[in-house]
Amino acid sequence: MNIKAYAKINISLDVIGKREDGYHLLKMIMQNIDLYDIVQVEKIPNGIKLKCNKPYVPTDERNLAYKAAKLFKETYDIKSGIYINIEKNIPVSAGLAGGSTDAAAVLKIMNKMFNINVPQSELMDLGLKLGADVPYCICGGTALCEGIGEKVTKLKPFTDKILVVVKPPFGVSTKEVYKAFDLSKVIFHPKTNELISNIEKNNIDFIANNMKNLLENVTLGRYKIISTIKEEINTCGALGSMMSGSGPTVFGFFDDILKAQKCYEKMKEKYVDVFITRTI
């Protein structure tokens, strides 16, 4: 059994507090894009085996999809072994939830495959044990995510918006970015409620001009290339550009497919991981 595991971007990312255990309290708008891994899960006699088409992706317990299979097996007392194959297209350590979306796919497939059929809400609770983005990845679409990511509220779908996505040639540790984040230095927070009402109105201009990610405060300071990519995308005629998640990936919204195509071609001359895609 296989499914597409979609990447996400953040239309906004606000940090509103910090828990005693060190986790940051977030308020963010998440959006799936038409860039995906293909995750296949099959039954085998015993154990967990994972294969991936990209050699730099770990195939042991360091992989979130492996952890998802192990957690599901333990939670629902599954005796069968599991074989996972990941055809990886989403860049890793990119701020696109590549690991989380694969883990979510494994949970969804195993839920059906073994006829456990727990409701989506229970699967999301399980996913939270793996990572803050996993509950959203189980749910997908356009959503407001709050708490540490566990509270997911579906929003009106913001589909078919053209975007160019560029990942610089390095990864960023989400943990390190949050560790360096200083909430006391934040002056302007994202206009989350206004963004939501303009998503409902399908107002791409407002979204592109007002989207905001507070983690840029950390990552842009460390990597000047991210600001450069944002400027390059804007120069190509984007309505607006922003870093996704903890970075380093940057995306720009376009209202013209030809401008987006030209931007894609221009960025492809300098960077390996460049995609032209749509919101779904």
Swiss-Prot record:
InterPro entries: GHMP_kinase_C_dom, GHMP_kinase_C_sf, GHMP_kinase_N_dom, IspE, Ribosomal_Su5_D2-typ_SF, Ribsml_uS5_D2-typ_fold_subgr. One of its GO terms (molecular function) is ATP binding. Pathway: Isoprenoid biosynthesis; isopentenyl diphosphate biosynthesis via DXP pathway; isopentenyl diphosphate from 1-deoxy-D-xylulose 5-phosphate: step 3/6. ATP binds at P91, V92, S93, A94, G95, L96, A97, G98, G99, S100, T101. The active site is at K8, D133. Belongs to the GHMP kinase family. IspE subfamily. This is 4-diphosphocytidyl-2-C-methyl-D-erythritol kinase. The gene is ispE.
